[in-house]
Design a protein with these regions (language model features):
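Short gly/ser-rich loop at a beta-strand->alpha-helix junction or flexible surface loop bordering the NTP-binding
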Residues: 2-9, 15-146, 153, 157-235
Length: 235
């Protein structure tokens, strides 16, 4: 394949990955180490943004650049559009940052995987927990846990309850997630807060009261209706 064709193919891949490419993808296209050095030299086509991840200089800089690069590192052979939750889902504080929920700083890149995986990066944290399909969505091209799952994950990590309360209200207000879904995800944590075991409604009320949002009563009505529907469907 001619060099011009190779570069064109790389640009096509990068277009679907926010202007980013992994070293593995570059090598699979037929570009060796020497050619890659030329491409990343001053005035070249690429710049290195993380170990084994490069950005096409002419492409717009994407939001959450470092998070996207860290996610690509998890499965460097696979293009973004072929990945599933098995290759890692953005979660915890990182997921909250993608939605712009709450105020917890995303000082590490956090991902949830079903199987253990090692990373040498100190700023990357891998959580090994089961993740159901309904607990994550595609957001801005990334697989990201839903806010109801984020809240539950943060509670498992013993995050500040006030921070979780703010995140919940921030998510329900623009309908990023639903009161009933939060009631479901909070249920396993109720006993730790002195409430009846499995009472996700009571814990949701506790968090919403803490947030002070004026829509609390309406949201609780929605959550109760959801819980009632679920109960009828399972009896």
């Amino acid at each position: 394949m001619q060099r011009s064709s190779v570069l064109r193919r790389l640009q096509e891949v990068a277009q679907e990955q926010w202007g980013l490419l992994t070293r593995r993808q570059i090598e699979k296209a037929g570009i060796g180490s020497t050619s890659l050095e030329r491409l990343t030299a001053e005035g070249g086509l690429l710049e290195r943004v993380a170990n084994g991840v490069y950005r096409v200089i002419a492409a717009p800089i994407p939001d959450h650049l470092n998070l996207r690069a860290a996610w690509l590192q998890l499965a460097p052979d696979l293009p973004a559009w072929e990945r599933t939750a098995d290759q890692g889902v953005v979660s915890h504080r990182s997921a909250a940052a993608v939605y712009a929920l709450g105020h917890l700083p995303a000082d590490r890149h956090e991902f949830t995987l079903a199987k253990r995986r090692q990373t040498r990066r100190r700023d990357v944290r891998i959580h090994v927990r089961p993740l159901q399909d309904r607990e994550w969505i595609g957001l801005r091209g990334l697989p990201v846990t839903r806010p109801s799952r984020i809240a539950s994950d943060l509670l498992w990590d013993h995050e500040d309850p006030e921070a979780v309360a703010r995140l919940i209200a921030d998510a329900i207000r623009p309908v990023y997630d639903y009161p009933g879904t939060f009631a479901d995800s909070l249920a396993p944590h109720a006993a730790r807060f002195g409430l009846r075991k499995g009472d996700g409604l009571a814990l949701l009320r506790w968090f919403l009261d803490m947030s002070g949002d004026p829509e609390t009563d309406r949201w609780m009505d929605e959550a109760r209706a959801h819980v009632d529907r679920t109960a009828r469907a399972t009896t």
